[in-house]
Amino acid sequence: SGVILDQYWNYVKKKKIKFNLAVSNTHLLNNFGYSKSDIIKDGFKIDDEIFMTLDGYNDVTMAKSLAIFGQSFSDLLNRVRPDWVVLAGDRGETFMASVISAYMNIPIAHIQAGELSGNIDGQARHAIGKFAHLHFASNIDAAKRLEKLGEQKFRIQNLGAPQLDDMQNTQKILIAQKKLEKKFVEISKINYALCIFHPVVEEYQRTKKNYSILHNFLKKHVKFRIWISPNSDSGSNIIKDSFNKLRDSNDLLIDNLPRFEYISLLKNCDFIIGNSSSGIIESASFKKPCINIGRRQKNRFSVRNVVNIEVINYR
């Protein structure tokens, strides 16, 4: 399960707060790793499952999938009637959950509010912020932005990025690394790039070209590449199909990993490349270089280990 879920669970147990856990989207899909099983293994009880993702993975199916989520989520809230809805990040289903919650007059707490990014997720994050009642920012830049956007100061708390707390848990990382090496490859004995390239909704027509340029560049310059599957946004099927056509014996694709197994991958890599927020937020904890490509994380708050490339242009 994700770090945010772990920390939230520890808090509500301590405070003896009852909560309802709903999982959706790729957590329930076999072709995206079926991470629901990881949530259960970590000891969480899943109260509701919201199936939403239509096949096709284009702009139309993505929009319809969000509409399906909205219908199901409103039924869930009507049945449970919680005192609060806790949302994290900037995903489309998170945005839909904020809209439904607000219109059903249920207060919203938003984790990692106020950050910038360059694609539709960034727009969703700020839209969620306008529906939310409590804003948990991950840095002072985001906290100040929330205030400039008109949110009341007493509602804003700068709590830091929750992902970073796990970076110092060396024992769990080492145990997870041993599990990962049994399943895939002995990462401690090879040099590799950690590659994560998600589709960009606004650049759907260029997905194949952009991904192919990146993959071919890495094949030429990096001996071993470990890839994490893209998310389910429109264009994800194009990336997966392109990977299968371009891959060779030095490419490894992993659909889903438990949290600490992923951290062990990040800790041992030579560098991380692509357009994932993990490179922006987490890689500096291990002093790993991050090559951030394109608009998806554009203007995201980052430190000196991140190199931003505006446009993929390789001959």
Features from the language model and the residues they span:
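Active-site and donor-binding regions of nucleotide-sugar-utilizing enzymes
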Residues: 1-14, 52-153, 158
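Conserved nucleotide-sugar phosphate-binding/catalytic loop shared by glycosyltransferases and other
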Residues: 15-62, 72
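Short internal beta-strands
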Residues: 18-25, 135-136, 224-231
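A nucleotide-sugar donor-handling region in carbohydrate enzymes
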Residues: 28-31, 131-209
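Donor-nucleotide binding loops and adjacent catalytic segments primarily
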Residues: 39, 175-268
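Short acidic-hydrophobic, aromatic-tinged amphipathic segments that line or gate anion-handling sites
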Residues: 47-51, 137, 157-159, 252-256, ...
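A donor-sugar binding/catalytic signature common to diverse glycosyltransferases
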Residues: 87-88, 95, 99, 110-111, ...
